[in-house]
Amino acid sequence: MKKTIKNTGPQLKDYKSNTYMDGDMEIRFAIGPEETKNLDTQKLAENFLVKELMTPDTLKLVYSHYDRVIIGGVVPVNKTLTLPNHPELRAEFFLERRELGIINVGGTGTVTADGRKFKVEQLSCLYLGKGTKNVSFASASKKNPALFYLLSTPAHAEFPATMFTKEQASPVELGAPETANKRTVYKYIHLDGIRSCQLVMGLTVMASGSVWNSIPPHTHTRRMEVYFYFGLPAEHRIMHFMGNPKETRHIVMANNEAVISAPWSTHYGCGTTNYGFIWGMAGENLVYTDMDPAPVATLL
C-alpha cells in the first residue's frame, strides 16, 4: 500500500526572514558566505547561535537546513519528558526517517527507547537509530538533573541502539600547554565507534590553562558541524570564530549554548577559562579526519 504523508501544516508560508517558528520548533534556513559577511552581531546570532537549550522541564528543538540537522536540549527535573513528533517532519514519529545522538553533560539520567531503559551517566553517549518510535528522558535526581544534548540527522538505514561511556570513546590527548590548546578528544559516533548513517559525534575537554579549541582551524565542505559548549562558569565566555577563512567573524557564547557551522565556515574558539564542547557533524561522509586546513597565519 502506498503511504500518504499527512500535510498538517499550512499550504503556503510567507518567509520574511531566515528563521521562523513552526509550533514549538524553530526552523532556520541555510545561508551562504556572501550573505553572512554582511550580517551584524544580532543577525549572526539569529542565524547561527542556539541559546536557552538547557531549560528545566523543557525539551527544545531547532531545525537547521544545513544538512537538515535538528539540535536539541532536554532537562527533565520534575517530570519525564518525551521526544515529540513535529508537523515539519511529515513523519509518523520523530525517528521514522532519522537517527539521534544523545550526550549527557549533567547528572545521571535515563533514556527509555521503545521500552528499553538506558542509564546515561555524565559524558556518556547514546545512539538511537532510524525506526525508534518512543523516546523519553528522566533524571535520577531533581537536585542534579541530567542535561541531555541531542543531535539528529536524516537516516536511510537502521543501526542498533548503542551506548558508550567516555572511557569507551577512545580518548586521545592533543595539543600542548605552550599553545594553550591541550585537550582530550572523545569520539563516540564514527566509523570505528558507534555506527550510524551519517551522524558523527563526540566531545572535547580542554585542560586547565588551555583555552583554544580546534587549532589549527579548518573547514570541511562535505559536512556541516554543530558545537555545543558546556562546563563553562557563568561569569566566563567563549569567543567562537566562524565564517569564510578570509572573512572571519565571531560570536560571544555562554555556557550550554550551541553554534551552527556551515560547511564553508571555519569553526574554532577561545574561552576566558577552560571548558568542554560537543561536536557533531552530518553530510557527505563519516570520516572524522576529512578536513581542509585553514592555517592561522592565513586567516583574515
Language-model segments: which ranges?
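Short active-site-adjacent structural elements
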Residues: R237-I238, R249-H250, Y268-C270, L286-T289
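Short, glycine-/Ser/Thr-/acidic-enriched flexible segments
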Residues: P76-V77, T108, K133, A234, ...
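Conserved metal-binding segment of the jelly-roll/cupin
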Residues: V120-A140, V252-T273, G280-A282
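Hydrophobic, proline/glycine-rich low-complexity stretches
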Residues: N7-H86, R90-L95, E99-L100
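Acidic, low-complexity central loop/insert segments
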Residues: G106-P145, L151-P154
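A short glycine-rich, His/Asp/Glu-containing loop-to-beta-strand
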Residues: D57-E88, K182-E225
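Double-stranded beta-helix
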Residues: K142-K182, I278-L300
